[in-house]
Amino acid sequence: MAELVTSPAYRAYLDGLIAGLDRAMEIANKAKSLGVDPRPYVEIPIASDLAGRVEALLGYKGVAAKIRELEDRMSREEAALKIGDAFVGKEFGESTREDILDHAIRTSMALLTEGVVAAPTEGIGKVAVRRNDDGTEYLSIYYAGPIRSAGGTAQALSVLVGDYVRRLLNIDRYKPREEEIERYVEEIKQYNNIQSMQYLPKDDDIRLIIRNCPICIDGEPTEQEEISGYRNLERVETNVVRGGMGLVIAEGIGLKAPKIQKNVAKMNLDGWEWLEELISGNTPAQEVEEEPGVHPKDKYMRDMLAGRPSFSYPMRKGGFRFRLGRCRNTGLATCGFNPATLHILDDYLAVGTQMKVERPGKACGVVPCTDIEGPTVRLKSGELRRIDTLDDANKYYDQVEYILDIGEILISFGEFMENNHVLMPPSYCEEWWIQEGGPRHPKNEAEALSFVLEGAYLHPDYTWFWDDCSEGQLIFLSDKVAGTGSLREGVLYIPEDPAVKSVLEELLVPHTVEEGFYVVRTPLALIMGLGLTDTLAKSPTWKTLPPFSNGLSMAISLSGLKMRSKAGTRVGGRMGRPGKSAPRKMKPPVHVLFPIGESGGMKRSIDNAAKICSSDSEENFRGTSVTTGQVEGLIQVQTGERRCPKCGTVTFKSRCADCGTHTDAVYRCPHCNQLGEEGQESCPKCGANLVCSKESIVSLGQEYAAALKNVGMSASSSPELKGVRGLISRERVVEPLEKGLLRAKNNIFVFRDGTIRYDMIDLPLTHFRPAEVGVSVEKLRSIGYTQDMHGADLTDASQLVELHPQDIMVSVDCGEYLVRVAAYVDELLEKVYGMEAFYHVKTPEDLVGHLVMGLAPHTSAGVLARIVGFTKAKAGYAHPYYHAAKRRNCDGDEDCVMLLMDGLLNFSRSFLPSTRGGTMDAPLVLTTTLNPKEVDKETLNVDVMPRYPLEVYTACLTYRAPKEVGKFVDYVEKRVETPGQFEGFSFTHDTTDISEGPIDTMYTNPILKGTADKIKAELGLADRIRAVDTNDLAERIINSHLMPDMIGNLRSFSKQAFRCPKCKTSYRRIPVSGKCNKCGGPVKATMHKGNVTKYLEISKYMAEHYTLSDYTNQRIQVTEMNINSTFGEEEKVQMDLSDFF
């Protein structure tokens, strides 16, 4: 594979990252060699490229070299197929056909998913060669739930790879039985009812796929429900719904058929001609536009959640106005908003909040951009004012009566490329105006009009929203101004009249209300647009006025001015998930992966468990090797079985307590007690799965006391230490208590794989100012940031600096948490490993320059990164490449960071759950270098130019496809394999501060104490927004959230189980004794009346205060009747006369 093309400066940056990693690896390996951990070496393999990630993820030695060889001469999709030739040739040591097929399919899927997600390891359960009814063989691939993370394209191509390899092995095609075909149809529809897939093919399309697909797409059971028809089929192993199978057929082959067809054509594969029929018949009807242009789409309004407001209905007047551009913190599914908009909307849209949008995608992340327009509001005084700064928003917030326009939404060209959405007319703006002849920003309205005489369009600041008005409204306003208005010293006075006020608000003309008059201080363009002279007389143009399609064309004709639409295209939006910046915690939070069973109670307290165990009776150990007098301080728990290779001691610890040697896991058969050898999965004698677990009798009191001594703590001063109830990994390996004590001391928590993580919402950033990230210029210069984006020396905190792709800005809260993690790691090295401290940090700024590991949920590859700053926002800012390397965009996705040394020292595969999906969200490999060719392709569409040419804006007016206009735009894909792929990026819009705006969303504000408060606040905001229909919103909330919840809980109440809160045993019915049969504790209901009735009162409140349909009102009444019939009506207290005195 060709070497990465970089500038010398960027190569030096990469070398610095690798040097820091090498130093950390050396120290971590030295520490791990002491044998304290499950393995005496760092368990996170390092990979510098895609091929290396694939090999590290799957463990097939030699496959990386082959992938590099193939990718040098063909596309990745072709390489994913051709790698099958190497497996068929047994180049990597496979011996059976099943191994060849299994490894080839997993490798191709890893290649297609950038070697990042867990789908290749977890999404394929197994492959099998089975027999058709005619005696021939066919290939069956068993897909599991985690196949979802691969995406539809990789899912579909994995089937194509299976077909390619089975041909090489002379295995025939799958020949389905009729009842199997119908089973697929019914099962996929049932799975869609459970999980709501992205795309559901028609029944006949499913039949077409199954009849013609040469591979049997099978699957493991993933859901709780069983299929109702076509059960107990001979060649289908389960009656339970198989989610993985449904995903591959529907969202894979059904949705991605065109992409499969392209690859079939490239590889000249026969037997897939039926795809043409599938493609011609499965175009989703909802995707087809009725006519050129864009039309209102309310898909984003479905599934409304109570308390999360709607800000703009689809293409509604007063909604978000589309502005074309990319700010330095937008792109990759993130959109910019003026900070004033964020505050005026009651702080619901905090920085990092997700917003569901009408177009061009489904959702976006919210970030501030001060270069775009804010909201236009009516104040309680009657004044109409546009608010463009956060200071003004704070000043006028309490005076706002009505929000007439919620401002602009900045969307980049790349978003239209990524979503394959037609371009659409943007709001007229200064950067467009300048390219159409505007010489400079006008000082005032008179100068703006003088520019028009020179051939320019009217400047956007003086272009009103003419196209929002009808012809009749403009005629009415013109008559009123001509008849009753007066122009004095350049200021227009119009007598108060609600009808006049309404039209002025439609036009969004700023004005005040003074002494009975509407006062317009910038009246010239308004007067001309109304066809009036400077004496407010009707101009001659009125006499020859033709009919018009909209108010803008009428105003242009009356005024003679060149004007464009200030409204542009409105975009609907509602609040999605709130932002997040919080430590990752297990439920309940724990400090150490040490099992204590039920001894620690609900809190899993190890120190309490040690005290409780000291008073346990001998009965707890009856039948064990413990004799009378030995009971004190002991617990019996399930742990891994390990043996010291030197002295033979059997223990549960990773290090032998007798001789200090690292111990080995012991696997044995649970049935015949036969010992297994390393690498064996099943018993060589009886075939049962080998296990590495046993009932261990642990002297918890002694272990706890020894751990306290080892870390220099006393029982009286040590913090509460929390462990786990049990271990769920195959080896059931135990963490040393010392690690837990040090974590508890520093108030940090462990995740299931031994690491300490901090979760944040993802946001993109390509440039930053030192002043906004809380780091001094001197500190930044010390880590390599010596120049600003223009090449000048970095000397001032206000200069703009281009962010390196593997540098990140974490939240301030995260920085403070990582300081504690660093203190823990230093103490761990000193007190457990007997080595020198590594971090020596006291403040968050001390972390600048230190390396971290980024990891996204559902993936298995960490990304090496470096902390260079902090943001006040509850989010993490990083380069688009960094997010794409984790297969994430920034539409509300979140992931985590962990200090590099913590991950290297504490992560172990031995801690991971042995169940399906156990290796997801675990750093099975670490990517050291980001290559734009090897990250998620969405980032290739990020545009990086300082301004869009005029051709792009004119293309927007005619709804051109973005690919037709791409030749005029500089975006990442054009820079790949040049030094410009890493540096020299630019942006069209700037922002003062990437954290400016609300930091915490109102949705999570404790002032809103419950759902009722949240709904009232949501509807109160909706009442003040012109772009929202409050009655419709109330109905949507009831029908999509409140009613389904109440009805579902009412049904669950009658079917509920009962549970012992002490030992967690569940019962279908309460035992006759009323107590738990296992531990004697109380048995309690899991569903209560409050769960059922919690939304009833707020639903009745909404029905009373808003206009709902008869259907919804009746649903509320019927639900109340059902609740009353279940629980009985509340008793009404009879009052007498004395109660009123």
From Swiss-Prot:
Domain of life: Archaea
Catalyzed reactions: DNA(n) + a 2'-deoxyribonucleoside 5'-triphosphate = DNA(n+1) + diphosphate; Exonucleolytic cleavage in the 3'- to 5'-direction to yield nucleoside 5'-phosphates
GO molecular function: DNA binding; DNA-directed DNA polymerase activity; single-stranded DNA 3'-5' DNA exonuclease activity
Renumbered residue ranges of the record's region Disordered: 567-587
Keyword terms of this UniProt record: DNA replication, DNA-binding, DNA-directed DNA polymerase, Exonuclease, Hydrolase, Multifunctional enzyme, Nuclease, Nucleotidyltransferase, Transferase
Tagged with keyword S-adenosyl-L-methionine: no
Any single biological process term in GO: DNA catabolic process
Cleaved signal peptide residues: none
EC number: 2.7.7.7, 3.1.11.1
A Pfam match: PolC_DP2_cat
Subunit structure: Heterodimer of a large subunit and a small subunit.
Function statement: Possesses two activities: a DNA synthesis (polymerase) and an exonucleolytic activity that degrades single-stranded DNA in the 3'- to 5'-direction. Has a template-primer preference which is characteristic of a replicative DNA polymerase.
Family note: Belongs to the archaeal DNA polymerase II family.
Protein name: DNA polymerase II large subunit
Species of origin: Methanocorpusculum labreanum (strain ATCC 43576 / DSM 4855 / Z)
Designated gene of the protein: polC
